[in-house]
UniProtKB/Swiss-Prot annotation:
Record-linked Pfam families: UreE_C, UreE_N
Protein name as catalogued: Urease accessory protein UreE
Intracellular or extracellular location(s): Cytoplasm
HAMAP family linked: UreE
Organism: Marinomonas sp. (strain MWYL1)
GO molecular function, one term: nickel cation binding
GO terms of biological process kind: protein folding; protein-containing complex assembly; urea metabolic process
Signal sequence residues: none
Length: 147
């Protein structure tokens, strides 16, 4: 069993001992009990409020390196050719504090029929797909205070 208390960031030159594949919701939690790809139990004890990143490296108490991978999960994918419609869609989702992954005139959200209907009414084409969900971290996630 590996106990993890330390984050190493997204760059590490040490060999990876095992990988854990996590959904977006799992990457958002500070305490996890998992099984690595090598079938070894992995317990994570990290600071809450700082989601794990896909590709991030963690270090166990015994010095072994564990890498975080993103799990493929069901997402709603919305797209359009019109930048104005796309901008409005992003605005309305942000106004609802919805976690959103943004590309060039496409976005992904967790499936939600109300939000999907809104996106459709704004002119976006909405489909469901299986993909790794990596939403934007948010404007205030860097932790700096400017008071």
């Amino acid at each position: 069993m590996l106990d993890i208390y330390e984050r190493l960031g997204t760059h590490c030159h040490d060999p990876v001992y095992t990988t854990v594949t996590l959904t977006h919701e799992q990457r958002d939690r500070g305490r996890l009990k998992l099984v690595g790809e090598n079938n070894e139990e992995v317990r994570v004890f990290l600071e809450r409020g700082k989601p794990l990143l896909v590709g991030e490296f963690l270090k166990s108490e015994c010095g072994k390196i564990v890498q975080v991978a993103g799990a493929v999960e069901d997402v709603a994918h919305a797209s359009c050719e019109d930048w104005e419609a796309f901008s409005k869609a992003c605005y309305h989702l942000g106004n609802r504090h919805t976690k959103i992954q943004i590309g060039e005139r496409w976005l992904r959200i967790k499936p939600d029929h109300v939000l999907e209907d809104m996106l459709h009414m704004l002119g976006l084409i909405v489909t469901h797909e299986e993909a790794v969900f990596v939403p934007e971290s948010g404007a205030y996630s860097h932790g700096h205070s400017h008071h």
